[in-house]
């Protein structure tokens, strides 16, 4: 990890599906903190006209493209979900490109610290970009219930996703800070504000 005086100082924010990463990130944004979402970077690198999209279509066939030429994420997700080897191929293509996008956007941060939000922060090696790691955590049953409600998914579908994500215990082992997000939004907001002031202290009290 780099020294806290280095600019920009980056906080990594991660958590499993249904943990409330996006809600926590929004609380930081409301406090004026610049945030880069790895999921957004992942969408940018496969936009029409980008080289990665052409490589994906060549590898998987035009069945992964919509009529407009945009990526059909559902079709691609189905292909890689059923084939770990194909998923690894896709990750090897996209992860370096996604990381380049992330680094470029983080370098533009103007706030006292910046946040990288990523569901794959640990698995992808993106944790090497950050100085501190915050895990948003909830019990697994809460993850399942929230995701079923949000995505209209079955319990079996959510459990299948959980199986391919890093185990909760492993994620927590990497954490510098843990925010257990199993209460209401007002409580989440107060916890984020508490952590925000702590991170400002780590940055030497800049505001």
Swiss-Prot record:
Q: Name one GO molecular function term.
A: dephospho-CoA kinase activity
Q: What pathway does the annotation place this protein in? A: Cofactor biosynthesis; coenzyme A biosynthesis; CoA from (R)-pantothenate: step 5/5
The protein's matches in SUPFAM superfamilies, at most eight in alphabetical order, are given as: P-loop containing nucleoside triphosphate hydrolases (SSF52540)
Q: Name one GO cellular component term.
A: cytoplasm
HAMAP family reported in the protein's UniProt record? Dephospho_CoA_kinase (MF_00376)
NCBIfam families in the cross-refs: dephospho-CoA kinase (TIGR00152)
User: Which PANTHER family does the UniProt record give?
Assistant: BIFUNCTIONAL COENZYME A SYNTHASE-RELATED (PTHR10695:SF46), DEPHOSPHO-COA KINASE-RELATED (PTHR10695)
Residues forming the DPCK domain are: 10-207
Binding site residues for ATP: 18-23
Instruction: Return the broad EC class.
Output: transferase
Protein's name according to its UniProt entry: Dephospho-CoA kinase
Annotated function: Catalyzes the phosphorylation of the 3'-hydroxyl group of dephosphocoenzyme A to form coenzyme A.
Gene Ontology BP, a term: coenzyme A biosynthetic process
User: Keywords assigned by UniProt?
Assistant: ATP-binding, Coenzyme A biosynthesis, Cytoplasm, Kinase, Nucleotide-binding, Transferase
Q: Where in the cell is it found?
A: Cytoplasm
| Species name | Pseudomonas syringae pv. tomato (strain ATCC BAA-871 / DC3000)
Q: Which InterPro entries match?
A: Depp_CoAkinase, P-loop_NTPase
């Amino acid at each position: 990890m780099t020294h806290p005086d280095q600019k920009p100082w980056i906080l990594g924010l991660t958590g499993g599906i249904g943990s409330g990463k996006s809600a926590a990130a929004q609380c930081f944004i409301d406090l004026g903190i610049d945030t880069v979402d790895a999921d957004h970077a992942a969408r940018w690198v496969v936009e029409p006209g980008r080289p990665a999209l052409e490589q994906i279509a060549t590898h998987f066939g035009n069945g992964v493209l919509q009529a407009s030429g945009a990526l059909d994420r559902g079709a691609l997700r189905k292909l890689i979900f059923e084939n770990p080897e194909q998923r690894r191929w896709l990750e090897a293509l996209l992860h370096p490109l996604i990381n380049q996008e992330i680094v470029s956007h983080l370098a533009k941060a103007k706030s006292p610290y910046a946040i990288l939000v990523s569901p794959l922060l640990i698995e992808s090696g993106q944790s090497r970009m950050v100085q501190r790691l915050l895990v948003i955590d909830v019990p697994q049953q809460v993850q399942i219930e929230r995701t079923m409600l949000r995505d209209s998914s079955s319990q079996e579908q959510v459990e299948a996703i959980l199986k391919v994500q890093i185990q909760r215990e492993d994620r927590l082992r990497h954490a510098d800070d843990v925010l257990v997000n199993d209460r209401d939004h007002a409580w989440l907001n107060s916890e984020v504000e508490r952590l925000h002031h702590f991170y400002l202290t780590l940055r030497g009290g800049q505001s």
